[in-house]
Structure formats: structure tokens, C-alpha cells
Amino acid sequence: MDLADIPQQQRLMAGLALVVATVIFLKLLLSFRSGGGKKRLPPTIPGAPVVGGLVKFMRGPIPMIREQYAALGSVFTVPIITRRITFLIGPEVSAHFFKGNEAEMSQQEVYRFNVPTFGPGVVFDVDYSVRQEQFRFFTEALRANKLRSYVDQMVAEAEEYFSKWGESGTVDLKYELEHLIILTASRCLLGREVREKLFDDVSALFHDLDNGIQPISVLFPYLPIPAHKRRDKARARLAEIFATIIKSRKASGQSEEDMLQCFIDSKYKNGRPTTEGEVTGLLIAALFAGQHTSSITSTWTGAYMLRFKQYFAEAVEEQKDVMKRHGDKIDHDILAEMDVLYRCIKEALRLHPPLIMLLRQSHSDFTVTTKEGKEYDIPKGHIVATSPSFANRLPHIYKNPDSYDPDRFGPGREEDKAAGAFSYISFGGGRHGCLGEPFAYLQIKAIWTHLLRNFEFELVSPFPENDWNAMVVGIKGEVMVNYKRRKLVVDN
């Protein structure tokens, strides 16, 4: 038979099969060669060398991690097409992940898909030295003196928002808290001008930005799909809005108590002030870092306290004790006294960290030792991952790890500290711990302090589940509650 007699489609399929076979052969050959010598490589998940890991990963990262942790242990490698992702699960093996410097363990390569959202010239679009200076701007904007002024705004927003509720009723707690969180973030982060005059417009633009981060965006952030086009249009419009606000503030000489003002006033070490584009990008990054975590965690905290009513009752009693000392006043220092509420929030975050995976790019070989004493060499070039969602439920660290038990963080137990550093990683840790952690706790505390003092609640919908389909794991469906207004009575 002549080659010309073979249908074109069959020739294409045969050629494709040959290419795939060649790739597989080369991958196997390279794997065999790299496995030689004295390197103790982590076990690789079984399956097809090129696409097996991808298939398992796409079925769900957490089920995959659970399955491979049981089969292979706390260190294993997942081949995904041309990349190799090595998972380090648990504090015994993840220390270098969190403590390694940027030359060894880099964020930039694995998080560059955020560049179209945050914009040029900020965070993952700049080299490490510039990024560190920009993180210094965040740190200065979140110092204790700044947080004190933010708390006043958080409390004012909560009081205004819940004053619109009736004497009793039924609401979707998830929707209500999501809406309040974005209002509060607009006031504290984006500024008075946005909160008072442009909230609806800016909120819609941030919605388009948020929806512009799809699973496909991680691999192809510039793919011309409708979600990306809406993202780019929204990003351009936000740049125009904030440029106008920045120019107005500078022209009038006015200064506000918000993160926007902090970024406007920030300067690099060489004396250069921030540009309008940099300020906009840093604000977007700040809102993305905090909005989802606060709204999701505030809802989970409420759902758990209403499901396990003893913790709701303990939180109410704590409010009574605080009110005996301070009356109705709520400020930064008073919120810091609320240990019961803090533990309720922290436990909700342990069970439901919004980010299911943290990633780094390895730029040098390193070695890890498991709790069983096995040593593995992690090669340069691997993507290295750990999972807060899975690591926060390890049974050798947390007793009854799937149970909601805020007292596990109380005096005498402190399970997260007993197991050592990086046992609780809802906010990351080490060199790249979340800068907004104090802000998040204050925001959630301020909201629930107002609710505990002014309302009774009953959870009337089924207990919620995780929404695994979202890039940031949220809550599936509605969280319906009955509420009844009441004023907390304090016995003197």
C-alpha cells in the first residue's frame, strides 16, 4: 500500500501516536538516568509517566494527596506532563519549604499567573529585591498603630450594616458576611472615595477580576477566553479610577487613614515614590489576599458555633466578661482580649483553609527526613508543594483531627505548638507567612463581637460543605440562619 492511499486523518493519528510514544520513551530514559547514582528520590505515584499524574490531579488534589500519603508517605512526586511536583506533607518535612531563601525556594515562577490580575510592576512581576520592598509597604500599612484605626472602621461598618436587619428574620449568613467584608475592605483598604461614591462600580470590577482567575489561568494566564478579556478590561478601568483618586489626594493635600494612603506615601530605599500603577496593583493584591479568607472564615466560624452550641455559649459568656470591664466599647486592645472567639476562628481556619495548596519552585537540591527516619533528595527544578487542607488534619498532630474543637488551642493542650513549627499552616509560615493575618483576625472578631452582643441565631439549613470547584475553596450553597435581635445583658 502506498502512503498516499492512507487517509489523511489516519496519518495524523499515527504521527501523533509516534510523537507521544517518543515523549514517553524520552521521559522514561531521563527518569532512569536521573534515578542513578546515590540520589534517594521520592517515590513517584504509579500510572502513565506523562499524563497519569495529571489525571489524578484533575480528579481532585485533596483526594489525590490523601491516597498517595497513605500509599507512599509524607514525601512523593507527581509527574504532570513535563513538570514534576513533589509534595511535602507535615512539619517534619516541610521546614525547608517555608524557611528556604528565594535563591533556593522561589514563589515567583509558580505564581506568575497572577500578573495579569495584579498588573505590571508589582509582586510577582518584579525581581525579589523589589518584591521585598513592596512587602515592606504592606508591613508598614499593617502595623499596630494602623490596625487600631482600621478597627474603628470595621466596627462602624458592622454597626451600620446590621442596623438594617429587622427584629427577627431569616438570612443567608454567607451572603451577608461576604457583602459586609467587601464593604469593610473598601473602607479600610481602598479608601473613603471608593466606599462612599464608587462602591458598586469597583465591586463589580473586582468581581470580574476574581472570575478572571480560572483553573486554566494557572497554565495559560493570557489565553484569550471571555473571562480573561473581562479581567483585562476590569483591570484597566480600576487603574483609571485609582489614578484619579491618587491625583485628587495629592492635589488637595488631604490624607486618609487607609491602606491606599500608606501606599501613596511609600518610598523605595533609593527615595523613589510609588507610581499610580504600583499603588493600584498593590491594592488589588491586598484585597485578593484578604477578602476571600475573611468572608469564608467568618462564615465557617459562625456555622460551627451554631452547630456546636456550647462554643457559641462560651463566646457569649466571654463577651459578658469583656463588657463588665469595658462596657460597650470595642477597640483593638479589647478585641485582643477575646481568646475564646480567637480559638473558635482559628479552629475554623484549621479545618477550612481557603488555599488548599502552597507552591514553590526549587532552585537547588535539598534533603528531607520523614518522621519515620527516611531521607529523600529533592532535585533542583521540581515544583515543591504542601497542603494546608491536608496537613492541618494530620492525626499525629491533632487529636480527632476532623472534629471542631477550639479548645485544642487552649492552655494545657496547644496541639499546634506541641508538634513544633509549621504544624498549623492556614496562613503559611516562615519567610512567606501571610502579612494580613492580624488584620483578618481583627476583622472577623469585630464582626462576630457585634453579632454575639446583639443577636440570637439558629442554623436552619444543612451544615455547609466545601466548594472544591473554586480556586479559593469557599462554601457551597447557602448558610441559612434565623436571627432574633436582643441586647446582651451584663450582671454587675
Swiss-Prot record:
Pfam families: p450 (PF00067). Catalyzes the 14-alpha demethylation of obtusifoliol to 4 alpha-methyl-5 alpha-ergosta-8,14,24(28)-trien-3 beta-ol. GO terms for biological process: methylation; sterol biosynthetic process. Its EC number is 1.14.14.154. GO terms for cellular component: membrane. This is Obtusifoliol 14-alpha demethylase. The keyword Membrane applies. It comes from Sorghum bicolor. The chain crosses the membrane at residues 12-32. It is a single-pass membrane protein. Keywords: Heme, Iron, Lipid biosynthesis, Lipid metabolism, Membrane, Metal-binding, Methyltransferase, Monooxygenase, Oxidoreductase, Steroid biosynthesis, Steroid metabolism, Sterol biosynthesis, Sterol metabolism, Transferase, Transmembrane, Transmembrane helix. PANTHER family: 24-HYDROXYCHOLESTEROL 7-ALPHA-HYDROXYLASE, CYTOCHROME P450 FAMILY 7. It is found in: Membrane. Pathway: Steroid biosynthesis; zymosterol biosynthesis; zymosterol from lanosterol: step 1/6. It is an enzyme of class 1 (oxidoreductase). Belongs to the cytochrome P450 family. It catalyses: a 14alpha-methyl steroid + 3 reduced [NADPH--hemoprotein reductase] + 3 O2 = a Delta(14) steroid + formate + 3 oxidized [NADPH--hemoprotein reductase] + 4 H2O + 4 H(+). Its cofactor is heme. One of its GO terms (molecular function) is sterol 14-demethylase activity. Heme binds at C434. It comes from the Eukaryota.
